[in-house]
Structures are given as C-alpha cells and as structure tokens.
Swiss-Prot record:
Homodimer. One of its GO terms (molecular function) is pyridoxal phosphate binding. The modification N6-(pyridoxal phosphate)lysine is found at residue 198. Keywords: Amino-acid biosynthesis, Aminotransferase, Cytoplasm, Pyridoxal phosphate, Pyridoxine biosynthesis, Serine biosynthesis, Transferase. It comes from Escherichia fergusonii (strain ATCC 35469 / DSM 13698 / CCUG 18766 / IAM 14443 / JCM 21226 / LMG 7866 / NBRC 102419 / NCTC 12128 / CDC 0568-73). The gene is serC. Its main location: cytoplasm. Pfam families: Aminotran_5. This is Phosphoserine aminotransferase. Catalyzes the reversible conversion of 3-phosphohydroxypyruvate to phosphoserine and of 3-hydroxy-2-oxo-4-phosphonooxybutanoate to phosphohydroxythreonine. The lineage of its organism: Bacteria, Pseudomonadati, Pseudomonadota, Gammaproteobacteria, Enterobacterales. Binds 1 pyridoxal phosphate per subunit. Its EC number is 2.6.1.52.
Length: 362
C-alpha cells in the first residue's frame, strides 16, 4: 500500500507506531483474551491505564501539583459551556478575546450563561490578517476570567504569547489544536482544555487542566457531567468514560515521551511549518494571508492563484497520497494540518507536490 499522509484538521493523523500497537492488542489486550474496549472502566486493569495516562500527560506538560487533570466528554464545544458554568461563581461577566472562528463560537455559547465583555483582537497589517498583542487587550475590572483560543484552526492564526495579566486574572484557554505541540507554562492559566482529536488521540475525549482553587464554584444548573468538582471527585469516572479513546491517548503520550517529549515536538513542528510556509512564500502561485507573527504552526491555510484549479489540486493531491487538504467551508482554498503525528516526510511530500503542480499549471 502506498504511503498516505492525512492532513485533516481533526480527527487527525495518529502516530503509525500507536496504530500498529493498538492493532496488535485489539482482540487480546494484556493477555486477557478481550479487547481494552470491552473491560470495565472500574476494573484494576483499566484503572492502571487511566493512572498511567494522567501521569504521562502531567510529565509531558510539567503540570504543577495544584492543578487537576480531568478526562471528559463533550469536546471543545462542551467546554464552551463548562468554563462559564464552573468559573463564573457569583460574577456575571467574563472577558472574551475574539481572534477567529472558534473564539467566536465560545463567545456565542457563553452568552447563555453570562454577559461577555468581547474584545475583538483581529486586525489587518499590510493587507495580512493579524492579532493585536496581549498588551493591547482591553480587559474589564469585574470579569470572572479571561478566555481566548491560542490557535484558530480554520483561520490559521496563532497567539503564541504567554499570558501575563497578574495573579488576579484567571485565564481560560482552548488549546484543542496546539496542546502538546510546544511547551506551555501551565501556571499562567486557571483552565486549559483540549479536545483530543488533533494532538492527543481519537475523537471522543476532552482533557481539562484546572487549578484546584477554582473547583467548587459550579453554577447550580451546571450538568453534573460538566461539573469539574464532580469529575475530579470521581477520578473522571462519574459516568462511563470513552475508554478506548483514553487508552489510545495514553499510547500517544508514551510515543511522545519516547520521541523526546514536547521539546522535541516543538523543534520538529517549527521545521515543518518553516518548510511549508517557505514553499508558499517563495511562490507566486500560492499565497497565505496571515501575518508571519501570527501564523499557525499547526494549521496552514493557503490559496491557489487561480481558484478554478482548486478541484484539480485536490484530486491530484489525493491520488498522490496527500489527503484532506480541502480548506474549511468558511474560508475555502486549501489547508494542511500538520500536528505532532505528521512526520517531516509528509510535509516534504506536500511541498514537492505543490512545486510540481505549479510547474504544470502555473
């Protein structure tokens, strides 16, 4: 079978070594004669899986001891509701920074539970899309927390600054598409959440990192399955968790550790992004309209000079083993998502194809 590279934004490519191990263990896990999908989440065998996964995740991100790690349902959209329901307390407003599609989606959901103070950070610089630096963000005095999305998958926009708004500001961030791709100073945040389907594992699992002093403030109307305190008190097993996704994510964590951890991912992700953006910038046939300071290393959108060639580009790239390059319906064009599991060889194959396509159709 020819090599296929999956550039999907999520569910995304998983490490080949992880898939092979899961395949080998699928019908007889740990010599039990059953699949890990079939065993009880409360049995000692799965409890060990869960504990190892949390331990490895904490180690990878150097999560401080005063933070809890929760393995949840609901995805990022579930957390759009969970954050205000858990963190507002007796306040009625929160600061939300709008830098793209997913930040706007979080704002829309938050309006059901509070009055968001929305700061539009989107700007245009020399004809390119950019984001205002954090020092220019206008925050309110009475907000329960500040929410932002460090990486916008659809827009290909990243906010790489580390927040430094003082100890009184609780920062909540949607790290769904950038978690584990580079080091994070977890201590600068009150809440970090991430859907698994991009850099962690398969869809169906969401991980929340929450500072323990923020627990116990949930709105009385908060569904129990979204209540951070209840999830923490029950070791993320208040109800049956997505056990297979949890197990696979644990394998990904071990793969990351075996391959140098987050620091190594940071380095290779920078290489991949520089290679792909270089191919775009050095061409008159392709273009990216995001300012260099805000370009995402995970999601690289690009347009062809003649969008009449889009369909042909997608057909030929798919035939060449380069899958899921179609841009999001909101922005069109192309998009290459190059998360941790995407090897450098995949990006090289893509840039080689782009150069060949340009020679033939430019």
């Amino acid at each position: 079978m020819a090599q296929v590279f999956n550039f999907s934004s999520g569910p995304a490519m998983l490490p080949a070594d992880v898939l092979k191990q899961a395949q080998q263990e699928l019908c007889d896990w740990n010599g039990l004669g059953t699949s890990v999908m079939e065993i009880s989440h409360r049995g000692k065998e799965f409890i060990k899986v869960a504990e190892e996964a949390e331990h490895d995740f904490r180690e990878l991100l150097n999560v401080p001891s005063n933070y809890k790690v929760l393995f949840c349902h609901g995805g990022g959209r579930g957390q759009f509701a969970a954050v205000p329901l858990n963190i507002l307390g007796d306040k009625t407003t929160a600061d939300y920074v709008d830098a793209g599609y997913w930040a706007a989606s979080a704002i829309k959901e938050a309006k059901k539970y509070c009055t968001p103070n929305v700061f539009d950070a989107k700007v245009t610089v020399d004809g390119l899309r950019a984001v205002k630096p954090m020092r220019e963000w206008q925050l309110s005095d009475n907000a329960a927390y500040l929410h932002y999305c460090p990486n916008e998958t659809i827009d290909g926009i990243a906010i790489d600054e580390t927040p430094d708004f003082g100890n009184e500001v609780v920062v909540a961030a949607d790290f769904s598409s950038t978690i584990l791709s580079r080091p994070i100073d977890v201590s600068r945040y009150g809440v970090i959440y991430a859907g698994a389907q991009k850099n962690i594992g398969p869809a169906g699992l969401t991980i929340v990192i929450v500072r323990e002093d923020l627990l116990g403030k949930a709105n009385i109307a908060c569904p129990s399955i979204l209540d951070y305190s209840i999830l923490n008190d029950n070791d993320s097993m208040f109800n049956t968790p997505p056990t297979f996704a949890w197990y696979l994510s644990g394998l990904v964590f071990k793969w990351l550790k075996a391959n140098g951890g987050v620091a190594a991912m940071d380095k290779i992700n920078q290489q991949k992004a520089e290679l792909l953006y270089g191919a775009i910038d050095n061409s008159d046939f392709y273009r990216n309209d995001v300012a260099k300071a805000n370009r995402s290393r995970m999601n690289v959108p690009f347009q062809l000079a003649d969008n009449a060639l889009d369909k042909l580009f997608l057909e030929e790239s798919f035939a060449a083993g380069l899958h899921a390059l179609k841009g999001h319906r909101v922005v069109g064009g192309m998009r290459a998502s190059i998360y941790n599991a995407m090897p450098l060889e995949g990006v090289i194959a893509l840039t080689d194809f782009m150069a060949d396509f340009e020679r033939r159709h430019g």
